[in-house]
């Protein structure tokens, strides 16, 4: 049990509730309740409800927090050293590992991910938009540097993420897993980079 110290600020208490709720979701999945969180924290359920009016609100806040951490890491990698191509690859591979290790391989968490995606929680929709924005910025930078071909960066980012869905979409990762036919994330990234470098129609196959 993690007792809540009386002197904690509301922000610190809110963060504690989120942390414990995430731990319980990893253990119990969708069965985790407000009462479970309150018991773990040594609080009353009524006190937890002061911060989150429902189990749904708390679950969505946890999703927003976890996905927000992935976005923060994506932005850090996107702003790091190296070419736009290298940073694009780093962002996509990071997303793959986060989704596989945190959202798919932990079965209880995956239960909640499935619910969140089927119900189109706002956190999921915000995550998609943020991912697209990160990739669009990298595409625009790559175009300025001559790494990528012409085209609207936002459109190219959306199409690229769709083409790479098998390495960042939790449901697709769960379906395919580590089967022999599954491409490693690096191979998918390489394919996407070739398309960004030559965004026009592919030349006909000459059989060479």
Regions found by a protein language model. Give the residues of each.
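C-terminal peripheral helix-coil segments that are non-catalytic and often amphipathic
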Residues: 1-4, 90, 129-145, 162-208
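Amphipathic alpha-helical segments enriched in hydrophobic/aromatic and basic residues
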Residues: 25, 33-34, 45, 55, ...
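Helix-turn-helix/winged-helix DNA-binding modules
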Residues: 29-30, 50, 145-148
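Amphipathic alpha-helical packing segments from all-alpha helical-bundle domains
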Residues: 68-71, 118-145, 154-158
């Amino acid at each position: 049990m993690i007792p809540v110290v009386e002197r904690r600020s509301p922000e610190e208490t809110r963060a504690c509730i989120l942390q414990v709720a995430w731990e319980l979701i990893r253990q119990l999945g969708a069965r985790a309740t407000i009462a479970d969180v309150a018991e773990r924290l040594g609080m009353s359920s009524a006190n937890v409800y002061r911060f989150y009016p429902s189990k749904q609100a708390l679950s969505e806040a946890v999703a927003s927090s976890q996905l927000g951490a992935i976005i923060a890491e994506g932005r850090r990698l996107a702003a790091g050293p190296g070419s736009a191509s290298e940073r694009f690859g780093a962002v996509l591979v990071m997303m793959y590992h986060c989704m596989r290790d945190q959202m798919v391989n932990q079965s209880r968490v995956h239960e909640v991910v499935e619910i969140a995606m089927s119900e189109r929680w706002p956190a999921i929709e915000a995550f998609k938009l943020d991912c697209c924005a990160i990739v669009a910025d990298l595409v625009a930078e790559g175009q300025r540097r001559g790494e990528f071909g012409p085209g609207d960066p936002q459109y190219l980012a959306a199409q690229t993420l769709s083409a790479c869905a098998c390495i960042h979409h939790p449901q697709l990762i769960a379906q395919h897993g580590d089967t022999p036919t599954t491409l490693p994330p690096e191979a998918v990234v390489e394919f996407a980079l070739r398309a960004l470098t030559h965004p026009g129609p592919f030349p006909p196959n000459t059989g060479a």
